[in-house]
Amino acid sequence: GVPGPNGDVGPAGPTGPAGLDGAPGAQGPDGEPGLPGLPGQSGKSGASGQPGVPGPVGAAGKPGSIRGQPGPPGPPGDLGRPGERGAKGVRGTPGAPGVDGVAGIAGAIGFPGPMGPDGAAGPSGYPGFDGVAGKPGPQGAMGPKGQAGERGPQGTPGTQGSKGVVGPKGVVGPQGDSGDTGDAGQKGARGTAGSVGAKGTVGLPGNQGPQGPAGLKGVKGEKGEVGDKGILGPDGDKGPTGMSGDAGPAGPIGDAGIQGPPGQDGPTGAQGPRGGQGPKGPAGAVGDVGDRGSTGPAGPPGPPGPTGGGIILVPVNDQNPTRSPVSGSVFYRGQAEETDVNLGSVADVIELHKKLQHLKSPTGTKDSPARSCHDLFLEDNSTSDGYYWIDPNGGCIGDAVKVFCNFTGGVQQTCISATKNAGDLKSWSGHSIWFSDMLGGFKLTYDISRSQLQFIRAASRHAVQSFTYKCRNSAAAVIFRTQDNKEIAANKVTYDGCKSRPSVPDAAFVAVETKRVEQLPIRDFASSDIAGQHQEFGFEMGPACFY
């Protein structure tokens, strides 16, 4: 038949079991930002970073309102250049007498002096104390064979020895002497001849016979062996006092003592004998132009002139009369021929005039050198310190020399410098203490001729030269070799930072001041405290100044 209508919905069935997990869905869109989280705990300190590069120098800050404490004294600065000459001040009032200065520091240890002469023999010394007994000496060598000694006395009988062992059977002794004839026996009956009997045994030895005569002297026996070393005998008696020994050799030269204070000036010596005539001096400078001389007398009449060609009438009113050298005479000048002027001669005269002016008023330039810095100052006392040209021998200016003029302190010093005047702070090696003989050393030379130097000395009464000794682990024990090949020490110490042999670089500032101007400038120097390990030195030689 036809299907009937749908029935009513039935009641819900029981819940089925859970299904299997589905596949992961696609990623959803980003959510909204969450709220800020709470602050985290502080982390551990990181490792220190590398030092950053130095930043740029900041701008100078404003002056503080509080004055800072004075800083520690800085190290000694380098020796500065002489400052410019200041204006001459007014004369001050005499000051009060100064207090006595403190004693100067002890000078550096000097070099060992020369060995002195042998001293006179001293008096004999007191007898010395008894010496202790000496140790036994070593066994001596075997002496030579001695002579045979005399026969000694007979010794005492020895004690009876123990019974000896039975000796081996002795050999048959010699036949004994015939015995005494026995008493005649009774005649026996004749027996039958018997067989030969066996040999009888040796009889017992007989008693010892009397001592025989002494035998002949035996031959000398061989030398016996060296006996054992004897025991040490008792100490001998004290011997008599020995004679004084010879003087011992001179001991080594002791270290030089510290330099003593300068002695008092000695009395003026007697006038020396008159010296021999010196060598001819150089030509003097060209003198100033002299004043015009007076008119000389009229000369003799000249020889007759050639015959003229007739009388020339000259108007009386000629406007060119010329005064004759002879007083009261007038002659008239004719028409002279034109002549060429030698312009070269005029230039020479002008040049000579300039040279004369330079000689009269030198300016210290290469074309106008002065004799010395002193002369330059006399020409213009406002001249400041600096380098100038001088020509001490006053000859051709081609050998003029450039020097430093020091006008500070009221003296006019002419100073010349060494062409190479410094050495670095380092260890110097060599077999000599003189700097010029060391590896890399050199002699101090000066760019000035001997002639010019002699004229500078001749015009000077004093000379001074400074020296800077740079040190590390070395004391400034320095001597100098002068131009006349003498050895001198510094006699002025401004500062000595080397006396304690510092392990860090330091310096000593010394100088040589002398009235023996021929000793300067210094040509070499030596240091006696450079032989140890880690010792270094350097130097700077200042200019030699004459005044």
Curated annotation (Swiss-Prot):
Name the segments for region: Telopeptide.
308-336
Source organism, top-level taxon:
Eukaryota
Where is this protein chiefly located? secreted
Modified-residue entries (Allysine), positions: K187
Q: At which residues is glycosylation annotated?
A: N381, N406
Q: Where is the composition biased (Gly residues)?
A: 272-281
Q: Which InterPro entries match?
A: Collagen, Collagen_superfamily, Fib_collagen_C
Q: Which GO terms of the cellular component aspect does the record hold?
A: collagen trimer; extracellular matrix; extracellular space
Low complexity bias: where? 27-69, 160-175, 246-271
Domain Fibrillar collagen NC1: from-to ranges: 343-547
One example of the protein's molecular function in GO is: extracellular matrix structural constituent
Pfam families tied to this protein:
COLFI (PF01410), Collagen (PF01391)
What keywords is this UniProt entry annotated with?
Collagen, Extracellular matrix, Glycoprotein, Hydroxylation, Repeat, Secreted
Region entry Triple-helical region: which residue ranges?
A: 1-280
The region called Disordered is annotated at 1-99, 116-311
Q: Which residues form a coiled coil?
A: none
Basic and acidic residues bias spans: 219-228
| Keyword flag Repeat | yes
Positions annotated as pro-peptide in this chain are 337-547
Q: Which family does it belong to?
A: Belongs to the fibrillar collagen family.
* PANTHER family in the cross-refs: COLLAGEN ALPHA, COLLAGEN TRIPLE HELIX REPEAT
Q: What is this protein called?
A: Collagen EMF1-alpha
Species the sequence originates in: Ephydatia muelleri (Mueller's freshwater sponge)
Q: What is the lineage of its organism?
A: Eukaryota, Metazoa, Porifera, Demospongiae, Heteroscleromorpha
